[in-house]
UniProtKB/Swiss-Prot annotation:
Primary role: Transcription activator that binds DNA in a sequence-specific manner, likely 5'-GAAATTTTGG-3', to promote the expression of target genes. Required for pathogen resistance.
Organism of origin: Gossypium hirsutum
Keyword rRNA-binding: no
UniProt xrefs under InterPro entries: Calmod_bind_C (IPR046829), Calmod_bind_M (IPR046830), Calmodulin_bind_N (IPR046831), CBP60 (IPR012416)
CC annotations in GO: nucleus
Gene: CBP60B
Location of this chain's protein in the cell: Nucleus
Single GO biological process annotation from the record: regulation of salicylic acid biosynthetic process
GO molecular function, one term: sequence-specific DNA binding
Family statement drawn from the similarity comment of this UniProt entry: Belongs to the plant ACBP60 protein family.
Name of the protein in its database record: Calmodulin-binding protein 60 B
């Protein structure tokens, strides 16, 4: 085997004579390794990997150059320095597009309304709503998502045109629909613009909407183009799996961010019977540690916070409520549809918002909450509409709390005389008087009128009568006797007017054969005449419902009052 010949020594200097000669094939091998890297990819593989990217870059650059050279804009260029007397206007998108748009769907704003475009003065920022410029024609184009990322507002017309995108080779037009819009009083709407291709084929994977005028404006007015926020365009097949903002209670749990349909989180939650957003939120409220363990102990704080933030943007159902009584029966909780405590009542008093509680009350509530969350099956559904009406806000039906003793026993005027009533009734002159000793507080009594705080509480025997204007509750047979089982006879609700000179008050009028409770009150601010509640009229809804509520409450305590009156009569020998 013959070795390669070396260069002769006499033809070179002393330095070159000492040079180590390397065979030619080894030189080529070292060069190839330097280019490809030791153990790197082959040249063909590198070409195959770089070719698509190079094609896109070359295609975009060549297309922009051809478009700017072959189709020069007829509009005045923003590269020119505008004269001091010239006017500068600009188009502007008012609404933001959503972060993700699907092919085949109309482009809409985040709130679901059409995207609006307005023409404003660049100096005063006032909208141009009159003149010939307020009705110019505008063209909608698609821009590369990288355009405007530096937040520059002084781009040139050529820069804007160079960022306009066209469809990929062999594809349909990138956008279809009404791409030319005529402004009306300086305002236009993007009603029917549809993407036909996704945005995954460009480097930033995002598009922007752009708007530019179609025809050149007269005079020295320059109108700058408008650009929208960047957004992604995905294939319409992904719309079936899109997230909801905000999510709804009945949405499946995979509608939440970071929970993929049929993914690991979804399967773990389904195994624990957490199928909807409502189930997710209920478990989050009652036992957040258990929820996080279901998702996996290794879940990062960032992923956890993202899921929780999206879930908490859900709006609870205002018509679904629950109550829970504590073990001591002193605290009653009012919970919403996801088991959050919204109001609390103590000893049957009015419901109070949680934020208005004292420190000691909050301790009691926390203890009751722990009991409730351990026994969620003991929560009682509570339909507030059955008591307060469907159209009345919850807080509107909570009058100022007043102590029962202050309301009923301020003026211990329990007289039994039978004076001549202003109602014109024929009554006997039999009379009696007594005082109540150690009266039991009556819970839940609230005034119908502020004047009732100083009103007396009278018990007078009368015969049944007919009156055009009355507010009466005909009670049970045997009221005032020792009968325990009663049967309501009639509930008559009509508009009430003052019938006595002492002011607003309650009058107990027991008849010894058939007793009745005449419930009279006056509401100067809400006066109605000779009309029943069911008729169409202008009334004060709050006062009307307060009347009904008070009547129902008086019905619930009438039995105890009758027993005490019976005992007093027996002690004084009034009856046998």
């Amino acid at each position: 085997m013959m070795l390669p010949t070396k260069r002769p020594a006499p033809d070179h200097g002393d330095d070159e004579r000492n040079e180590v000669m390397v065979p030619e094939p080894k030189r080529r091998t070292n060069l190839k390794k330097n280019i490809m890297g030791v153990g790197g990819l082959s040249f063909n593989k590198i070409v195959l990997n770089l070719e698509p990217m190079l094609r896109i870059w070359v295609h975009e650059a060549v297309e922009a150059a051809i478009r700017s050279s072959i189709h020069p804009s007829s509009r005045p260029s923003l590269n020119r320095i505008e004269a001091s007397r010239g006017r500068r206007l600009q188009l502007r998108f008012v609404d933001k597009p959503p972060s993700t748009i699907f092919t085949g769907s109309k482009v809409e704003a985040e709130n679901g309304n059409p995207i609006r475009i307005i023409l404003v003065d660049a100096t005063s920022q006032a909208m141009v709503s009159s003149g010939s410029l307020s009705s110019i024609k505008v063209e909608i184009v698609v821009l590369n998502g990288e355009f405007g990322t530096d937040e520059r507002q002084d781009w040139t017309e050529n820069e804007f045109n160079a960022s306009v995108l066209r469809e990929r080779e062999g594809r349909r037009p990138l956008v279809t629909g009404d791409l030319n819009i005529t402004l009306v009083d300086g305002v236009g709407t993007v009603d029917n613009v549809i993407f036909t291709d996704n945005s995954s084929w460009i480097r930033c994977r995002k598009f922007r909407l752009g708007a530019r005028i179609v025809q050149r404006s007269a005079g020295e007015v320059t109108i700058r183009e408008a650009t929208s926020d960047a957004f992604m365009v995905k294939d319409h097949r992904g719309e079936l799996y899109k997230k909801h903002y905000p999510p709804l209670l009945h949405d499946e749990v995979w509608r939440l961010e970071r929970i993929a349909k049929d993914g690991a989180f979804h399967k773990r939650l389904a195994y624990k019977n957490v199928h909807t957003v409502k189930d997710f939120l209920r478990l989050l409220v009652t036992d957040p540690i258990a929820l996080r363990n279901i998702l996996g102990g290794g879940i990062s704080n960032r992923v956890w916070e993202t899921i929780i933030e999206h879930a908490l943007s859900c709006v609870p159902d205002d018509d679904e409520w629950y109550t829970y009584h504590g073990t001591a029966q002193r605290v009653e909780l009012l919970l919403n549809s996801i088991y959050n405590v919204v109001k609390v009542t103590f000893d049957g008093q009015d419901y109070l918002p949680v934020e208005n509680l004292t420190f000691s009350q909050k301790l009691l509530v926390e203890d009751a909450k722990r009991q409730a969350y351990k026994n969620v099956w003991n929560l009682t559904p509570f339909d507030r509409r059955a008591i307060m009406g469907p159209s009345m806000p919850f807080t509107d039906l909570l009058p100022e709390p007043v102590g029962t003793s202050n309301l009923l026993l301020q003026q211990h005027d329990f007289s039994g005389t039978r004076p001549d009533m202003p109602l014109g009734l024929n009554q006997s002159s039999t009379s009696f008087s007594y005082e109540v000793e150690n009266p039991k507080p009556l819970q839940g009594i609230e005034p119908l009128n502020p004047m009732l705080r100083n009103s007396s509480f009278r018990m007078e025997g009368i015969f049944p009568y007919n009156a055009d204007n009355s507010f009466s509750f005909f009670a049970d047979d045997g009221f005032g006797t020792n009968q325990d089982n009663t049967q309501a006879q009639m509930l008559s609700l009509t508009s009430a007017t003052p019938a006595w000179a002492q002011g607003s008050g309650f009058i107990f009028t027991p008849d010894y054969e058939t007793s009745s409770i005449s419930f009279l009150s006056s509401f100067p601010s809400c006066n109605v005449n000779d009309r029943s509640i069911g008729e169409t009229r202008e009334v004060c809804p709050k006062n009307r419902w307060l009347k009904v509520r008070a009547v129902i409450q008086w019905k619930s305590i009438s039995r105890g009052a009758a027993k005490r009156r019976r005992q007093h009569w027996l002690q004084h020998g009034i009856c046998t």
